[in-house]
Amino acid sequence: MTRKTDDIFAAPLQEMIDFKFDERVVAVFPDMIQRSVPGYGMIISNIGILAAKYAQAGSHCYDLGCSLGAATLSMRQRISQPNCDIIAVDNSPAMIERGRELLARDSQPTVPVALICANIQDVVIENASVVVLNFTLQFIPPEQRLALIKRIHAGLRPGGILILSEKIAFSEPARQHFHVEMHHDFKRANGYSDMEISQKRSALENVMIPETVACHQERLLQAGFSSSELWFQCFNFASMVAFK
């Protein structure tokens, strides 16, 4: 199927409104994420590899903020442990509806998937071996993040993992400037205009709040995780795995 091109911010907007995952975004999301997030495909692929290693028999794997289910599909295609299932959650009805269509096309549905439209803060996490927050925590208000991570830790089995991917910030101004500029250059190289980059940045300003890797790592320790590893970084995008 032909991938629809993201042109949401291609024309000047008369009034800037906060970014939201509505039907317009859902229609172009695969194109948007590939052209906007350096290394996205590698992150998705390796989420499946991590899940294959750490999924435990008879447990749940959670994809919190699943969008169209890319991480869910990656896990589904890799997990071989018996009696595992995946619980995929997103609060966008349009995302869940489209995600259900895409999952239905999977030719080897060996692992059951439950798609749930809900706020991830309201979902009960229990008997989990793998939990994924793939570019999701950054959209949760900062003051609510620790409580969510604590709930995830409490719902994980011993030996379970949390995979946390985020756009990140840097405390040193020079490093922050470098990574922001390189990200903008990455987007330009993928066909976005300066106006598109500027308008999307403004739309996300009050919605997505990045933090430093150190901030994430400290929160993971506060929540009870024994350790964490930064396993991927490209410019100001990173993914970590935390161990219970």
UniProtKB/Swiss-Prot annotation:
Pfam families: Methyltransf_25. InterPro entries: CmoA (IPR005271), Methyltransf_25 (IPR041698), SAM-dependent_MTases_sf (IPR029063). S-adenosyl-L-methionine binds at residues 40, 65-67, 90-91, 134, 201. Transmembrane segments: none annotated. Belongs to the class I-like SAM-binding methyltransferase superfamily. Cx-SAM synthase family. Catalyzes the conversion of S-adenosyl-L-methionine (SAM) to carboxy-S-adenosyl-L-methionine (Cx-SAM). This is Carboxy-S-adenosyl-L-methionine synthase.
